[in-house]
């Protein structure tokens, strides 16, 4: 198997943590689209949103997704990458999509503990638990629609990676 693996889910779901571990287990390259955008634009996510608005950020996100897609690559997508129907079609057509699902309470707790959180702009201006409830309510169907596999992102990263490896091995046998 050499296809691209896309990790989708809300902020704090574990896409980067699990994506890195999965890439290491597979001998793949790992790319985080938010980090890629920051490196190529020389701006933080907050700075891109401030200067170009959310539409500009989403456009950059789509371009980054296409730019980093390559065989033997695990990609941690931005939480909102699924908002674009073009992004959803692109990911489904170019690899396997894994949705890391977690409750709003778990996501809020992880984000509150994340030192990078300060550079991520609020999507709604609400407290983080309320924001995550809103985000999940508006995106859950999109995450489900794009995903080839849905996994419980609240488990330990090693367990999630093990489950992904088993799923991918099972697909190769079919």
From Swiss-Prot:
Instruction: Indicate where this protein resides in the cell.
Output: Cytoplasm
Provide this UniProt record's keywords sorted from A to Z: Amino-acid biosynthesis, Aromatic amino acid biosynthesis, ATP-binding, Cytoplasm, Kinase, Magnesium, Metal-binding, Nucleotide-binding, Transferase
Superkingdom of origin organism: Bacteria
Q: What is its main location?
A: cytoplasm
Q: Name one GO cellular component term.
A: cytosol
Q: Which GO terms describe its biological process?
A: amino acid biosynthetic process; aromatic amino acid family biosynthetic process; chorismate biosynthetic process
A Pfam family assignment: SKI
Region: LID domain; residue ranges are 112-126
Stored PROSITE patterns: SHIKIMATE_KINASE (PS01128)
Q: Detail which positions bind Mg(2+).
A: 16, 32
Transmembrane portions of the chain:
none
Sites binding substrate sit at 34, 58, 79, 139
Per UniProt, ATP binds at 12-17, 120, 155
* HAMAP family in the record: Shikimate_kinase, Shikimate_kinase_2
The job of this chain, per UniProt, is described as: Catalyzes the specific phosphorylation of the 3-hydroxyl group of shikimic acid using ATP as a cosubstrate.
Q: Which family does it belong to?
A: Belongs to the shikimate kinase family. AroL subfamily.
How does this protein assemble?
Answer: Monomer.
| Name of the protein | Shikimate kinase 2
Q: Which species does the entry assign this protein to?
A: Yersinia pseudotuberculosis serotype O:1b (strain IP 31758)
